[in-house]
Each structure stands twice: as C-alpha cells, then as structure tokens.
Amino acid sequence: MNAAKNTLSIKSIFLDFKEITKAGLAISVLFSSIAGYLLGVNDEHPFKWSVLIVLAIGGYCMVGASNAYNQVIEKDIDSLMDRTKNRPVASGRMSKVTALIVASLLTIIGIVLLYTINAKSAMFAAISIFLYTSIYTPLKTVTSLSVFVGAFPGAIPFMLGWVAATGEFGIEAGTLFLIQFFWQFPHFWSIGWFLYDDYAKAGIFMLPTGNKDRKTALQVILYTIWLIIASLLPVLGYTGQLFISPVAAVLVFLLGLWMLFYAVRLYQLRTPKAARTLMLVSVSYISLLQIVFIVDKFLR
C-alpha cells in the first residue's frame, strides 16, 4: 500500500514538474536551438555531441525556468481561465515557494550549463529569462505591446543554437533571430484570437487592436509577409555563412505562401476556427522551415 502511494506521489511530482515547465512547449523551443546549432557547425566549429547535449539540457532549463516563474506570477490570473486553472500553482497542488525554488534551480543549472559552452550562450539565456518573466509577463494585463516584448525572448532559442556552435553573434545569428521574431506575431495573435474569451476573463491583452477585427487580421498578414522576406534573406548571399540554395529557397517560399494563405483566410473569416488553424499551421511552418535549412546545408 505504501509502495503504491509512493509511486503515485512520484508520478504526481513528475507530472507537476512537466506541467510547470510546460514540457511540450519547452521541447518545441528546444528544437529551434538544436536547429540553430546544426546550422552553425562547420569545419572551424565542428559538431560535438557533448555541446549538443549540454545545449539541450541547458535550453530546457532556460525555457522551464521562464515558464515556472510565469506560473508563480500569474497564479491568480491562471485560476480565472479554463485553460490554465488546473496548473500546479494555480490549482494549489504546488506552493508558490516550491515553484520559485524549482524556477531558481532551473535558472542556475541552465545558465551554468550554457556557460560551459560559451559565455554568450549563458548571457542570452539570462536575457531571455529576464525579459520573459520581468517584462513580458507583467505587461500581459497592461497592454497588447506585451506580444512585441515577448517576441524578443521568444526569438532567442533559434539564434542561441548558432551562438552555442560558433561562440559568435553576427549577421547569421541575427538573421535566425529575425526569422523567429517575425514568426511570433502571427503565432501568438492567432492564439489570442481563438482564446479571446478565456483571456478576457483574466484581463489579458493579446490582440494589437484589442478586438477580433480586420485591423488585427491585417497585421497578422503583414507580419507573415515580413516573416517570408526574412526567411529568404539567406539565399541572397548577404547573411555570411548562413546560406540556403535556390531550391531550398523555393521550398521556404512555398512554406511561407502556405502560412500566408491561412493568414488571409483569417482576415476573410475572422473566426476562432480560422485562428486556431493558423496557429497549428504556424507551429508546423517554423519546424519545417528549420528542417529545410538543415537538410539543405548538409546536402550541399
């Protein structure tokens, strides 16, 4: 009987840890860092399994810490929304003190691990955690500009992989940052659209106009176009060692048109279903784009 209780307790702790760090989100973000690392390795900076593993663990800690801090800060807000009311801190399964300890440990472990790769990686991880928890999270209930602020830490992981591989932040890392920066807007605005009512309960501002209207949908289209332009910069030869072939550029452009189609569809329909579809497409888009970049590099 005691063994069964202990097993249940361990399972509950694991599930709460998984939820407070948002494991699914953390792993998807981690994929961006790994993609950036694979794009950054070369003869001068060869691939190393040890670096990749440390980047993966450190990156997970970075994202997990941000998410844990977020759930501590938004305990009362989370309890108001159907989507978040069962989170560990909001539901009372985990105390704020325990969550803060978890977040602090993840912060320390993540930054120390990334520092063993290079100082710049640790610095960008620290900046990401600070921006996400200290500026983006509090702004969510104040202004829709929170999405703009949140786009900065959200765009760091892709770039972080390149910095981990090379130890340098130049035009290449900046381009990867730019791609994921512009991607944040259609992605998060589509989430803010189809979860509009839930966010409204907690007084969270996500949409640029505050409403599910044509002006918001138009901005989704415009940022998707900026995303397409940014994603094609590497084919022009102006982004240093970050380069994609014309064939890869065609694939990247087609992916962009695919996402743009659903952005325009949101403008036409302005329904939660259209917004949710765009959100799902955006998630697939960024992963497929990164895969195209990687495959193209290693096939050349």
From Swiss-Prot:
Primary location recorded for the protein, binned into one broad class: membrane
Q: Which residues cross the membrane?
A: 20-40, 49-69, 97-117, 122-142, 145-165, 176-196, 217-237, 242-262, 278-298
Biological processes, Gene Ontology terms: heme A biosynthetic process; heme O biosynthetic process
- Enzyme class comes to transferase
Q: In which pathway does it act?
A: Porphyrin-containing compound metabolism; heme O biosynthesis; heme O from protoheme: step 1/1
Q: Which reaction does it catalyse?
A: heme b + (2E,6E)-farnesyl diphosphate + H2O = Fe(II)-heme o + diphosphate
Q: List the Pfam families.
A: UbiA (PF01040)
Q: Which InterPro entries match?
A: Protohaem_IX_farnesylTrfase (IPR006369), UbiA_prenyltransferase (IPR000537), UbiA_prenylTrfase_CS (IPR030470), UbiA_sf (IPR044878)
Q: How does it sit in the membrane?
A: Multi-pass membrane protein
User: Can you name a GO cellular component term?
Assistant: plasma membrane
UniProt keywords, alphabetically: Cell inner membrane, Cell membrane, Heme biosynthesis, Membrane, Transferase, Transmembrane, Transmembrane helix
Where is this chain's protein located in or outside the cell? Cell inner membrane
Enzyme Commission (EC) number: 2.5.1.141
What does the record give as the function of this protein? Converts heme B (protoheme IX) to heme O by substitution of the vinyl group on carbon 2 of heme B porphyrin ring with a hydroxyethyl farnesyl side group.
Q: What else is known?
A: Carbon 2 of the heme B porphyrin ring is defined according to the Fischer nomenclature.
What NCBIfam families does this protein map onto? cyoE_ctaB
According to UniProt, the name of this protein is Protoheme IX farnesyltransferase
Question: Gene encoding this polypeptide?
Answer: ctaB
